[in-house]
Amino acid sequence: MKKEGVDVLVVIGGDGTLTSARDFARKGVNVIGVPKTIDNDLASTDVTFGFNTAIDVVTEALDRLHTTAESHHRIMLCEVMGRNAGWIALESGIA
């Protein structure tokens, strides 16, 4: 990267992206890492980039499923992303 004149690598992403950024930093590349995760599981933050969008998408899907479940007298379950955190399930359930 230095041969190409890259002074710094700016990365925005989740665990995988930041792990790769760490590997570049260990090889001497200047790296700025910006955490972005829909899981909302980063310490010292109230809300992470992507979390509100995830809630909007899940809430819309739940609204549509609710109508179908109600008209057919069914109970439906919805699995959402979140890895080891349950924030998306909690917030979308409240919404």
Q: Whereabouts are the PLM-identified features?
A:
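ATP/pyrophosphate-binding catalytic subdomain of soluble kinases
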Residues: 94
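Conserved SGNH/GDSL esterase-like catalytic core that processes O-acyl groups on lipids
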Residues: 87
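Active-site histidine-anchored catalytic micro-motif
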Residues: 1-79, 83-84
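Alpha-helical segments flanking ligand/cofactor-binding loops in enzyme cores
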Residues: 22, 90-91
